[in-house]
């Protein structure tokens, strides 16, 4: 039975892991933003809970690698998704043995390590028969990379969805005391690049509210929000309160009450609070990126 990545079974998992290996060591190796649901902490949680599936596992495949396996019969571990999992050393671009050892795994539990652009194999005979295709080669793609069209390299991107990913592309990891303090991530990219970015809670806030409200059309909510007083109430979208609350509208109201702000009462006020809070958070992260990036940030590309 699979877990949702927002399942509370990993609450406190990073802190439990850091009692054995200091956070500074883990970040120094991986450069990855510490989040409860990183695969490193999920696997460690399974290990601590004596999970029978993990104990019996011969190979571990990330979702993109599982799809490649279904197509080719070849078990591989693709670099970018393994990097995001917080299992890769950002400087060697290989799985970090010290982390694997701590969660009771070895290199043998993972498939052949591949990078974007490498050939994984060809379609299996069964897939060829089902699809009518021939022995088409299957090439490894970046299993966890947001793409953005750009004419030059002096840009930042904002991939806006359930999560908002804001970052820049760099030629090498940026792993410093400041990036660790700000909890920025250095995810492996294509052609030797690194994506220095921050994961921000995005439209999850609005999606959950809409679910509670009966899927009111976005257009109606936006019009109503436009009639409301600006900057009346603001939240920190990344507060743990909003990770997976039983009721998102109530969580927003609770936050505003706790911080002695006017409590948003109407749908429009709540939507305006969400949008303005996200916009301010984006501005805050963009300012940090300008200071951290080795190149000037001259444009922001927003995709979704």
Place the predicted regions along the sequence by residue.
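A charged helix-plus-loop insertion that forms the helical arch/lid used to bind
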Residues: 2-9, 83-87
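Short, glycine/charge-rich flexible loops or terminal/linker lids adjacent to PRPP-binding catalytic cores
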Residues: 7, 121-126
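Active-site core segments that coordinate phosphate-bearing ligands/cofactors
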Residues: 11, 18-31, 35-36, 41-75, ...
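Helix-loop-beta segment of a Rossmann-like dinucleotide-binding subdomain
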Residues: 77-83
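Short beta-strand to alpha-helix junction loop
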Residues: 91, 116-123
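A conserved helix-loop-beta module that forms one wall/lid of the active-site cleft
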Residues: 97-116
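Short linear loop/turn motifs
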Residues: 111-119, 222-226
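Glycine-rich Rossmann NAD(P)(H)-binding loop
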Residues: 303
């Amino acid at each position: 039975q699979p877990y949702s990545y927002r399942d509370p079974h990993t609450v406190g998992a990073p802190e439990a892991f850091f009692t054995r290996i200091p956070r500074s060591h883990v970040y120094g190796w991986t450069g990855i933003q510490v989040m409860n649901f990183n695969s490193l902490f999920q696997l460690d949680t399974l290990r601590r809970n004596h999970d029978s599936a993990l104990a019996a596992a011969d190979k571990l495949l990330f979702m993109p690698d599982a799809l490649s396996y279904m197509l080719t019969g070849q078990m591989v571990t693709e670099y970018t998704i393994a990097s995001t999992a917080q299992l890769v050393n950002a400087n060697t671009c290989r799985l970090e043995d010290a982390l694997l050892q701590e969660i009771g795994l070895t290199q043998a539990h993972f498939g052949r390590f591949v990078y974007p652009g490498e050939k994984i194999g060809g379609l299996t005979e069964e897939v060829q028969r089902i699809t009518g295709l021939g022995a088409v080669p299957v090439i490894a793609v970046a299993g966890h990379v947001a793409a953005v069209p750009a004419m030059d390299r002096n840009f930042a991107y904002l991939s806006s969805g359930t999560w908002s990913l804001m970052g820049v592309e760099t030629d090498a990891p940026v792993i410093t005391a400041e990036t660790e303090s700000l909890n920025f991530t250095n995810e492996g990219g294509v052609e030797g690049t690194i994506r220095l970015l921050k994961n921000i809670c995005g439209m999850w806030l609005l999606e959950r509210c809409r679910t509670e409200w009966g899927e009111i059309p976005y257009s109606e909510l936006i019009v109503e929000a436009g009639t409301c007083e600006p900057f009346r109430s603001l939240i920190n979208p990344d507060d743990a309160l909003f990770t997976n609350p039983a009721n998102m509208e109530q969580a927003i109201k609770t936050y505003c009450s706790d911080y002695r702000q006017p409590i948003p009462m109407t749908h429009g006020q709540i939507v305006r609070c969400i949008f303005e809070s996200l916009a301010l958070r984006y501005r805050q992260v963009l300012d940090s990126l300008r200071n951290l990036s080795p190149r000037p940030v001259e444009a922001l590309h927003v995709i979704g």
